[in-house]
Amino acid sequence: MKLFYKIFVFLLVSNICFSQSSSNEATKLRQEGKLEEAIKAYKKEYYKSPKDSKNTYNLACAYALTSQKDSAYHYLNSALKDNTSLWALVDSDLYELTDDPRWAKIESAQLKKFQELNGAIRQVEYAKKLLNIILKDQALDYYIDQAKNFYMKQGYVPQWYYPLGSYKQKIGHENYSNMEKLIREYGWPKYAMVGELAADAPLLVINHHKSDSIRKMYLPIIKQNCFDKEGSCMEYAKIQDRILVNADELQIYGMQFRYNAIRELEPFPIKDPEYVDQRRKEIGLEPLKEYLKRKINYDWTVIQKNKS
């Protein structure tokens, strides 16, 4: 149970989701763990609208989640034909594809298209390695999320969860070690060096590390980059709040959640909650009411004030 709890907490603090939207029927089936049925639903939509790149992308993801690599690559290449973003390179749904030689072609193609549109990335090889770290940081989340849903419905941990949880922790240890090596070689990543998406890699790994001593060690540089607009203030807020919550102190940005007595998510207690939006605004975050409704469907009703 201890292992499940650790991964369970990890899922609460991990807020990245890179899957794109598609048909409600297919998405519902996917969320329920019915991947083969989801594939059929995505393909049905594909035959009706073959140029719908979002649906085609999700079809590729569903194939990847079921380790059907050839089909996954077929639809992924189609979906990304006119796509100039880097999101596919960090989508954990595609993790199963990354040990295939074809993945390098996907990486190169997306990085080329992205730079043609947005300008050259100063350290593109560093960016590529950081993007891979982000993808691995989220690896297996779909399957572990299925275990979480099972636990919430049935009240006990499914036996198939434990090897996944153990492997997830192993990936986390390897990712942190690789991150340290990259920082020693290239320096701390900033937006100007590797782009906004890649620069978030160390923050995600640090936030998901089991040790608060690691988070505390890196917090000053994470905070400074936030204020210098060279790093994510969202991830800084998550890390700062996680340190406080783990020390049984009040969080200050409202980024950490817990399950209450009726197994519904709510934010951990917040210091001076009537001023939380003012603190969030100072680092460019949306009002807490909007954030909580969007992330956990929680109604935040504390009336906000401003200190002069």
Predicted stretch roles:
Residues 58, 91-93:
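Canonical tetratricopeptide repeat
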